[in-house]
């Protein structure tokens, strides 16, 4: 039976780099929020153990694709049999992409989290969110927040999560044809890595910033130009390591008014924030139907 699952985009409302570990990973303080916008993932269970990605991404091999890696990681787990017993552990996976790749919206991590949650259900496993988050962390630091599906303040490498209440806001997200590698930004020698750690209450009361933004603006002139352009209408920041930027509004119409003015070669969308991610809502619906 074919099933379609949400794979939402996230924004980093702020992002501060507070240090670097001996293993190279960076210590962060960031606030994740979810948008009512994202990819759609269709999964068809197979009667064998093949994992087939029906919509490959250019320049990414099948075996290295995060979605395939997520499915195989779960496939390798002993599992917990549900009342239906042992089910086939294969799948055909298709992704309808709306979230730009290399944009800082968490598209790959979100896709991986959706696959872990969906296959956990479809294969009759019974792993908890906490157990899936541990698996997800092996795939990427952002995967756990998509597993839990709540707006959250993150510390550590992004894996220590504290749920946060976030008001309903509207966001204009803009981007060009630039794609940015997270690894490249975090390895840049000019990246600020010593922002003092602060309490969440202090961070929420202070102006929001992204420590990656100065480096990204310097290395990618198109991002710099876009941030300069939108500043005539509204404050804007980078999300993640870019290349997407965003502005916050109280109403949808305010955001759409600016979207209509964007220069040629600039793309974007308008979406509202949501306290619970669209993916988590999907699973709450599934659980209510089962019960």
From Swiss-Prot:
Sorted UniProt keywords: ATP-binding, Isoprene biosynthesis, Kinase, Nucleotide-binding, Transferase
Enzyme Commission code(s) on record: 2.7.1.148
GO terms, biological process: isopentenyl diphosphate biosynthetic process, methylerythritol 4-phosphate pathway; terpenoid biosynthetic process
InterPro entries: GHMP_kinase_C_dom (IPR013750), GHMP_kinase_C_sf (IPR036554), GHMP_kinase_N_dom (IPR006204), IspE (IPR004424), Ribosomal_Su5_D2-typ_SF (IPR020568), Ribsml_uS5_D2-typ_fold_subgr (IPR014721)
Quaternary structure note: Homodimer.
Active-site residues, Swiss-Prot/TrEMBL: 10, 142
Function, as annotated: Catalyzes the phosphorylation of the position 2 hydroxy group of 4-diphosphocytidyl-2C-methyl-D-erythritol.
The protein, known as: 4-diphosphocytidyl-2-C-methyl-D-erythritol kinase
Similarity comment text for this entry: Belongs to the GHMP kinase family. IspE subfamily.
List of residues binding ATP: 100-110
Gene3D superfamilies: 3.30.230.10, GHMP kinase, C-terminal domain
GO MF annotations in UniProt: 4-(cytidine 5'-diphospho)-2-C-methyl-D-erythritol kinase activity; ATP binding
HAMAP family: IspE (MF_00061)
Known catalytic reactions: 4-CDP-2-C-methyl-D-erythritol + ATP = 4-CDP-2-C-methyl-D-erythritol 2-phosphate + ADP + H(+)
């Amino acid at each position: 039976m074919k099933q379609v699952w949400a794979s939402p985009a996230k924004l980093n409302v702020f992002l501060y780099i507070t240090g670097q570990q001996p293993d190279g990973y960076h210590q962060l303080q960031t606030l994740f929020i979810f948008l009512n916008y994202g990819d759609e993932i269709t999964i068809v269970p197979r009667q064998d153990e093949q994992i087939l990605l029906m919509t490959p991404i250019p320049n990414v091999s099948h075996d290295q694709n995060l979605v395939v890696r997520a499915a195989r990681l779960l496939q390798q787990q002993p599992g917990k049999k549900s009342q239906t017993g042992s089910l086939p552990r294969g799948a055909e996976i298709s992704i309808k992409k709306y979230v730009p790749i290399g944009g800082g919206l968490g598209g790959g991590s979100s896709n991986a989290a959706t696959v872990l949650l969906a296959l956990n259900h479809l294969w009759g496993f019974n792993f908890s969110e906490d157990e899936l988050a541990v698996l997800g962390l092996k795939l990427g630091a952002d995967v756990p927040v998509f597993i839990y599906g709540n707006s959250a303040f993150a510390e550590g490498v992004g894996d220590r999560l504290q749920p946060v209440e976030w008001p309903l806001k509207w966001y204009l997200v803009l981007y060009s044809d630039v794609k940015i590698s997270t690894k490249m930004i975090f390895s840049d020698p000019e990246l600020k890595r010593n922002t003092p750690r602060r309490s969440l209450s202090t961070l929420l009361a202070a102006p929001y910033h992204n420590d990656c933004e100065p480096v990204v603006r310097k290395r990618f002139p198109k991002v710099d130009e876009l941030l300069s352009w939108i500043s005539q209408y509204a404050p804007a920041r980078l999300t993640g390591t870019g290349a997407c930027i965003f502005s916050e509004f109280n109403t949808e119409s305010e955001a759409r008014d600016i979207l209509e003015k964007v220069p040629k070669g600039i793309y974007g969308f308008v979406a509202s924030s949501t306290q619970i991610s669209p993916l988590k809502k999907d699973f709450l619906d599934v659980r209510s139907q089962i019960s």
